Amino acid sequence: MPTLERCLVGLLLAWAGAAGAGAPAVGLGEPLTQAQLARHDITVFPDGRNLPPGRGSVTEGRAIYRAQCAACHGEKGIEGPATRLAGSDGLFGWDDPLRIIRIKKYPLLIWSMGARWPYATSIFDYVRRAMPHTAPKSLSDDQVYAVTAYLLHLNELVGANAVMDRQALPKVKMPAQGRSVSAWP
């Protein structure tokens, strides 16, 4: 950029900064109340911080899943048009020479939620804030614990009699935890 253009750009930036310096604040919006903030402050951390009270079993989760989730994810978490929820590390092994071709042909069969998510608490967090797709945040905390328990069972990470709550859920070891880079210790 020639020197004259640099000078003009510099003068323009200095003028724009000075012109805005004396302008009053815009003052849009209003402060959130604690109740409003609490509705949105629902992030669950890998260590279980911010998990709500409640509990849910695999058996309860199976019934809720069939009513609320199976239409999109399939009866067993592998048949639906939406993301695969259950299964192994994917249909295609890392050593499969045709892996790239198969992935392009069957993109939803690569990784299940149980194989790619590093923390069980992330499943709870996602289900609570985003599912079911047609009515996000409509499940109670007990229902979310139950659906999470069922999804973990579909992935053979917990037994058929498992009950998830704020103590049990963070203790579930996910297969991807060891192969993930995380900001959480």
Regions found by a protein language model. Give the residues of each.
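Bacterial N-terminal signal peptides that target proteins for export
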Residues: 1-8
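N-terminal signal peptide c-region/cleavage motif recognized by signal peptidases
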Residues: 16-20
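Electrostatic cytochrome c docking/interface patches
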Residues: 27-64, 132-136
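Sequence context surrounding c-type heme c attachment/ligation sites in exported
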Residues: 59-67, 78-79, 117-121, 138-141, ...
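The canonical Cys-X-X-Cys-His
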Residues: 61-76, 85, 97, 147-151
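Gly/Gly-Pro-rich "capping" loops immediately C-terminal to redox-active cysteine motifs
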Residues: 78-123, 132, 166-169
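Flexible coil segments in periplasmic/lumen-exposed cytochrome c-class electron-transfer proteins
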Residues: 98-102, 134-185
